[in-house]
Design a protein with these regions (language model features):
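Bacterial N-terminal signal peptides that target proteins for export
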Residues: 1-8
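Sec/Tat signal peptide C-region and signal peptidase I cleavage site
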Residues: 17-23
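Hydrophobic helical h-region of N-terminal Sec-dependent signal peptides
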Residues: 9-16
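A residue-level marker of the well-folded mature domains of exported/periplasmic proteins
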Residues: 23-330
């Protein structure tokens, strides 16, 4: 019996050690899938960059329902993974509960704030990046009508839309902006067919540039715009390559940076908790120009958007944050 106990104890010790060695950091994605070519894929890119540079493996999990977040966070924490990174406001309550239960584990949440001493909260000034692409949309539009298709109808996505409207109006005060949301549940992040239908409706009303902030649903926006000879605007990742010459630009949100820094800081014993806000000044949000869209961006547009970036950093242009008062001035 004593020998059996020793063998079992040794096996358990080996299993725990192997788990920690092979999968120290852990990453939980938002709904929509790891390879959504948008938000989740940006997070994945940050994890892969860390893995390539540090030679450290990580584990990840792709939830398929709103109920799986807490289970995944607790599972990783209980198995010794550190840090545990969750990329979505949807996991806020789960993070609050589990992080309190594991005070010695480091946690990171993206797109939400959890006020605990072992949690880093990374939020973005999406309104600033959306303002920049809105400015470009307003300058590129020939009809004076542009569109916005959001994913799930939540305050965060209205923040994108509000920043976009402000940028469009800065370029053309008389412009008309059509806005639609794909849905009200997590399924709205992964419904490109519905997003495409909304885009076609906006195009039928005269929109010639449509901005998608809808996760994997946004692929339907870009596809529909391209199919109808109009311009799309990507989000989160640089999506210009998806339809070369048909994507005006992408509002790049550096989710990869949040994940990479979380993994790296923990490995390097440099982890700090608290809120990190990433905007234009921190290169947390920006617009994308590359070989796929450079011919769509005129020198005048470049000058205008670069001036807007400088003015935002200087504080002479203040982009209203919808989430500050649940309203949009335009």
């Amino acid at each position: 019996m004593t020998m059996m106990k020793s063998l079992l104890g040794a096996a358990a010790s080996v299993a725990l050690t192997a788990g920690a060695a092979l999968a120290d950091p852990a990453l939980i994605f938002d709904l929509g899938g790891k390879f959504d070519k948008s938000f989740n894929e940006a997070a994945h890119a940050g994890a892969e960059q860390f893995k390539a540079e540090a030679g450290v493996e990580y584990r990840d999990f792709e939830p398929t329902s709103d109920t799986q977040g807490e289970q995944a966070i607790r599972n990783f924490a209980s198995r010794g993974y550190n840090p545990v990174v969750a990329v979505s406001f949807a996991w806020t309550s789960a993070m609050e509960k589990v992080a309190a239960e594991f005070p010695d584990t480091k946690f990171v949440i993206v797109d939400a704030v959890v006020d605990l001493p072992n949690v880093r909260s990374v939020v973005y000034n999406e309104e600033q990046g959306s303002y920049l692409v809105g400015l470009l949309a307003g300058m590129a539009s020939e009809t004076g009508k542009v569109g916005f298709v959001g994913g799930m109808d939540i305050r965060l996505i209205r923040k994108f839309g509000c920043g976009y409207v402000q940028g469009v109006k800065a370029a053309n005060p008389d412009a008309q902006v059509f806005q639609n949301m794909v849905g009200t549940t997590g399924a709205a992040w992964n419904d490109p067919v519905r997003a495409g239908e909304l885009t076609k409706n906006q195009i039928d009303q005269g929109a010639d540039v449509v901005y998608a902030a809808a996760g994997a649903s946004g692929l339907g926006v870009l596809q529909t715009a391209a199919d109808n000879g109009k311009l799309g605007i990507g989000v989160d990742s640089n999506q210009n390559h998806l339809h070369p010459g048909k994507v005006l630009t992408s509002m790049v949100k550096r989710v990869d940076l949040a994940v990479y820094n979380a993994f790296k800081d923990t490995q390097g014993d440099a982890f700090t908790a608290g809120v990190q806000a990433l905007g234009v000044e921190q290169d947390g949000v920006t617009y994308a120009v590359d070989d796929n869209n450079k011919d769509l961006i005129t020198p005048e547009m470049t000058a205008a958007v670069e001036k807007a970036k400088a003015d935002i950093v200087a504080g002479t242009v203040k982009v209203h944050d919808y989430m500050s008062d649940n309203s949009c001035p335009n």
